[in-house]
Amino acid sequence: MSSSSSSGAATGFAVCSDPQKSFSKMFKRTVILLAGPTGSGKTAVSLKLAPLVDGEIISVDSMQVYQGMDIGTAKVSLADRKEVPHHLIDVCHVQESFNAVDFYYHAVQACQDILSRNKVPILVGGTGFYFHTFLSGPPSGPSPDFVLREQLTLEAQERGISALYQELELLDPVYAATITKHDKNKIIRALEIIRKTGSKVSSYAWQSTVNESKEYHCRGWLLSPDPELLRHNILERCDQMLEEGLLDEVQALLAAGIKGNSSASRAIGYREWIEFLDLGSPPDLFEITKQKFITNTWRYTKKQRTWFKRCSLFRELRPMGMTLDDMAKKIAQDYFLCG
């Protein structure tokens, strides 16, 4: 995995709320955030936006960091990456771990590099907790309690990991919305923190120290398409991924050892087909597995929308009647007005 920048990297992000404020002082220190649920079109919009603001894109996707996870993550093509520079894509092998803290230091390092060349960082993605960490600093938390962790691991075996996830949803719905009910390690660690301290995991992340210098100014937009359009996009997206060779990609990842990484192997679009292949690819289960893939993707988009709508930094942009160019121009105009 690529080396991270030092832990002393500058942080501190502020929202620019005054359109009349001169952007001459802040212009090249402003970071654009473009978020949205899976299938909202944020990648396509970002590729139109980058040339308008002389920007480079930083991926905010917890799975696009992995080499070989291309089709199932809708990773931007190599041709598009040649046209618009991208960062935090293909950072590590599927057997390596990569978490929010790793993302934070990589993203800050990328921002500093982009800004040093007088260009604009554009953070694009749908992983809410990574945006959260970028804005507030790396999550802090108590030291591991291995006795409690072992107890929770036994509970997971006895009650099932879904039962522990339901408990987490009740105790810390904000954090629970950022992970899946299959992410055993994160669920157990979250409950370990909650039971040990009585505090929510999400509150630890937001309480991280923010640099008083407010070196960066963040402007956030949330693509928020109509639910019916989003559902249509997801159906098309899942079909397209299968046509492009998702099953072959999963086979290659199994050979590369993806099962050694619980986060990567449980990612939506991969876990369903890993299970299918493990069962010997029975033809009668193909359509059932495909429906699971679609359903799980749709459920995840609902969680994404819930998370982003709770974050006041993002201003909603509804694509109804707008082309990709229209949306990119709208964001660019707002950006130049505020800086």
UniProtKB/Swiss-Prot annotation:
Chain segments carrying region Interaction with substrate tRNA: 61-64
Keywords of the record: ATP-binding, Magnesium, Nucleotide-binding, Transferase, tRNA processing
Cystine residue pairs: none
Catalyzed reactions: adenosine(37) in tRNA + dimethylallyl diphosphate = N(6)-dimethylallyladenosine(37) in tRNA + diphosphate
Record-listed ATP binding positions: 36-43
Annotated site residue numbers, Interaction with substrate tRNA: 127, 149
InterPro entries: Dimethylallyltransferase, IPT, P-loop_NTPase
Binding site for substrate: 38-43
Bilayer-spanning residue ranges: none
Single annotated GO MF: tRNA dimethylallyltransferase activity
Cofactor(s), by name: Mg(2+)
EC number: 2.5.1.75
Biological process (GO), any one: tRNA modification
Assembly and interaction partners: Monomer.
HAMAP family named among the record's database cross-references: IPP_trans
Role this protein plays: Catalyzes the transfer of a dimethylallyl group onto the adenine at position 37 in tRNAs that read codons beginning with uridine, leading to the formation of N6-(dimethylallyl)adenosine (i(6)A).
Family: Belongs to the IPP transferase family.
Protein name: tRNA dimethylallyltransferase
Species whose genome carries this gene: Chlamydia trachomatis serovar A (strain ATCC VR-571B / DSM 19440 / HAR-13)
